A protein has these predicted regions:
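Conserved N-terminal beta-strand and adjoining loop/helix that marks the start
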Residues: 1-25, 44-47, 78
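A short coil-to-beta-strand element that immediately follows conserved catalytic motifs
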Residues: 68-77
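Active-site-adjacent beta-strand/loop module that shapes the phosphate/pyrophosphate-binding cleft
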Residues: 79-105, 118, 122-123, 138-141
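Short, charged, solvent-exposed linker or helix-capping segments at domain edges/interfaces
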Residues: 102-111, 127-132
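A generic structural signal for short hydrophobic patches within well-formed alpha-helices
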Residues: 48, 125-126
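Charged phosphate-binding loop/patch that engages nucleotide di/tri-phosphates or the phosphate backbone
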Residues: 132-144
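Conserved Nudix-box catalytic region and its N-terminal flanking loop in Nudix hydrolases
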Residues: 23-65
Length: 144
């Protein structure tokens, strides 16, 4: 934390992978004690490592969390949210996927292991947005 007491910032990215029928790739977060947004369906997302670009973060989400290659597209939107002890700044991007997403085994260093994958309408992300999911709020507000 900076010496002036201001909250430290963290950057993150999330992806909105859309099929031709308009459904968006959704992942279910673990329903475990201590997990943020337990059991909620949301967008695949990742906190960026120091020096990691948004595009690199999107590709990492594909490899580590979806077992598929992602290509970044246009920005859906950006958001900021105060969390416990830090400020989260997130970009949500459209992305295309090569192959079918799958739940890989826990990768070394991965912080969230999703428990399920599905394709849902954008309106389905409203619950997660209301429960505090920044990426889902950005998606729902953009109405893409």
């Amino acid at each position: 934390m900076p010496s002036d007491g201001a909250p430290q910032g963290r950057r993150a990215v999330a992806v909105a992978v859309r099929r031709d029928d308009g459904l968006v790739l959704a992942v279910r977060r673990p329903d475990e004690p201590g997990e943020e947004l337990r059991g909620v369906w949301g967008l695949p997302a990742a906190t960026l490592a120091e020096g990691e670009s948004d595009e690199e973060g999107v590709r990492r989400i594909g490899r580590e969390k979806l077992g598929a290659e992602l290509t970044i597209g246009r920005a859906v939107g950006y958001g900021e949210q105060e969390r416990d002890g830090y400020t989260l700044r997130m970009g949500v991007y459209e992305a295309s996927i090569a192959g079918e997403p799958r739940l890989p085994e826990r990768a070394a260093g991965a912080t969230t292991l999703y428990t399920a994958i599905d394709w849902l309408p954008v309106a389905s992300f409203r619950e997660a947005a209301e429960r505090g999911s920044l990426c889902c709020r950005v998606l729902v507000e953009a109405r893409t």
